[in-house]
Amino acid sequence: MPAAKKNSVTSALLGLLGSRRDTPETFDGEEQPAAGEGQLENHLGGDEARNYRQYEYDMVAPHVGKSLLEVGSGLGHFSEQFAGRLDYLVVSDNDAYCVEQLTKRYAGNGDVEVLDLALPAEINIRRKVDTVVMMNVLEHIKDDVQALKDLASVVEPGGRIVIWVPGYMQLYGDFDRKVGHVTRYTPKTLEATVTGAGLGIDVLKPINFLGGIAWWLAVRRGGAGYPDPKLVKIYDRTVVPTTRAIERVVRPPFGQTVFCVARVPE
């Protein structure tokens, strides 16, 4: 690749991720709801980011059964992709606005239950599910082991808890502090959390290798901040497909995200 093109791609990645040096301080001193890197994914959630949304779905979908509890549902855009294959869906959040909107969205739908849920906590749902999905949630919870134990209590024996978390403390920066991240995980630290909750592991690996490199560079420049929406399309069209192509043939040594499928004992 010509040097000029490399520099333009790097600049686009860094602009997408932002930096303390270039981005005004907007933090109001209060932790945001359990959105985590969902703040990034809010920018990657529209039509301009179809590749990224497909990346998430393709990673998670093979592990989703017929009944699903989603933790940290936001407005429900991710779980709605599974609606046609589920006979029971529980959506949840700990943000009052999100819970209100989810309640309105699913009013009158007897196959969907809406919960106001802040883990760790006792979970009361109509029946057990075969799958839990938590996208960018666990990193907000100090007692992450207990949170997984609470979730396991409402999963059928042999069921799965699908976990998507930000990876590697070397990537921890202003963004993480602003959104209330307690930590970023490595496969080793996430394994310790999952096994500490009494769960087995089917899948555990870092993903989004190129995104991890860009995030690291942004932190080195002064702290990863909020994404520049103008560059989301560039990221989606160039970085996401390239990352996916690499990860089809090579297991990356690290990544922006750590992905895990935990198994509830039979």
Segments predicted by a language model, with ranges:
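Conserved S-adenosyl-L-methionine
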Residues: L199-L210
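C-terminal helical/coil "lid" or tail adjacent to the Rossmann-like core of SAM-dependent
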Residues: G211-V240
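Core SAM-dependent methyltransferase catalytic element
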Residues: W216-G223, P253-E266
